[in-house]
Amino acid sequence: MIIFPAIDLKDGQAVRLTKGLMDSAKVYSNEPYELAKRFEEMGAEWLHIVDLNGAFAGEPKNIEQIEKIRKNTNLKIQLGGGIRDEDTIKRYLDLGINRLILGSIAAKNPKLVSELAEKYPIAVGIDAKDGFVAIDGWDKTEGILAKDLAEKYKDSKIECIIATDISKDGTLTGLNIDFILEIQNASQKPVIASGGVASEEDIKKVKENNIYGVIIGKAFYEGKIDLQNVLRENA
């Protein structure tokens, strides 16, 4: 199981949102690359980055900070937020990003995303509100069930699916493990669990269910999880 510490970027700062609401942003660092270095020192191998401004704008908005993180660490990076076309994918790969997360475009055009996954290291981000897929920075809900979307990627070459229950995200109320397993069963792909991780109990649940990875955000920033210990135990 892979532990993915998370950095969400808004206006060049590292923040966390509650339930995906931009006006709920709480700033945790003005120098996100320093946070990334700390994660690396703790033993992380991967970093999960979301360009929040990019997710709402539909194009990259925090490139400078992303470049700084890339230059200052040897972490493997998966990145999402505002990646809607092939040019953006190429641009980020040229920067040295290891995996790109496609969300809104993956919901709107599974055929295109499956074609892109033949050429590039792609993860699909499935973000759900009440079981339905949310897009465009979680601003809108598509009339498609998350599990039905996951099933569309069953035969694709995507590397994994990042499954987020938005109602849990940033709430520290515990992971919705049933939702994660539903996505895993529907897609038959490796799944990264996201949204609501509150304690090391959640991480144990992920491990027990043979889930590929888990994203840790607010639980670390608010001191609910000893990240160094979790990384050591799951190395």
Swiss-Prot record:
Taxonomic lineage from the root: Bacteria, Pseudomonadati, Campylobacterota, Epsilonproteobacteria, Nautiliales
EC number(s) on file: 5.3.1.16
Compartment annotation: Cytoplasm
Keyword annotations of the record: Amino-acid biosynthesis, Cytoplasm, Histidine biosynthesis, Isomerase
Entry superkingdom: Bacteria
One GO cellular component term noted in the UniProt record for this chain: cytoplasm
Name of the protein: 1-(5-phosphoribosyl)-5-[(5-phosphoribosylamino)methylideneamino] imidazole-4-carboxamide isomerase
Active-site feature positions: 8, 127
Record field: catalytic activity: 1-(5-phospho-beta-D-ribosyl)-5-[(5-phospho-beta-D-ribosylamino)methylideneamino]imidazole-4-carboxamide = 5-[(5-phospho-1-deoxy-D-ribulos-1-ylimino)methylamino]-1-(5-phospho-beta-D-ribosyl)imidazole-4-carboxamide
